[in-house]
Amino acid sequence: MFFVKILDFLFARIYFYKLNIILLKLILRFLGFNHHGNLKESGEVLFLNKICKENPLVCIDIGAYVGDYSKYILENSNSSVYAFEPILKSFKKLNKYKKVYSKRFFVFNEAISDKIGHKKIYLDKKNLHWSSLDTEIKSINYLKDVKNYETCKVNTLDNFLKKNKNLLKKKITLIKIDTEGHEYEVILGAKNLIKKLSPKYIQIEYNWHHLFKNVNLYKFSKLLKDYEVFKIFPFNKELLKIDPTRPEHNYFNYSNIIFKKK
């Protein structure tokens, strides 16, 4: 404790603030945050490998982009995959896998939310994977100049289930949600599906967007009361169980969170 007080006295000063921020960002990476990139760099490939070994029957990919996540599941298991992607350019690339996996891959050019209709989706043409339904996207400094948008069809998973009742006879292993800050609304619009079909895993991307929407992991955990909370690390096959009530697990930095059915 005395040693900590000495460090406090030396470094808890405005002079060292910028240096301390750099150190904080480094520590956050060591804690599993901010590992952007492909499935391997984020650690998702290790999680997906685990899923595929469990012989999944149905996986749902929301915010499928160009299909890397869906493709991995299709290539490494016999699971059916339902993929949703609202951006037309990305959807066309995603749809190409339909030719190879026509009996197991079902693609939909629409966004998933808590309401049905049509909505603007804001996009950076150079980085379409950053596209979001939320106007809060412009509060993030690297997206503040985003002016382009498309109008897309918006659906809910509950409504999708009503029109695809064959899913009621199947077991959903995984729902993956990567919607750039819109994850909470997706889950709100899937309450009945989650209640009836009890998917084993629900994966969300948790990031800076949620700060501006006042949605933290604790709020997600209250919505998914029957699920335990875990975190993906980039170099570990195992998931780390975390306590969503703890502030150290609620940093608004990029991470992949897994909700596992209790």
Regions found by a protein language model. Name each.
Residues 1-262:
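Phosphate/nucleotide-binding beta-alpha loop and adjacent structural elements of enzyme active sites
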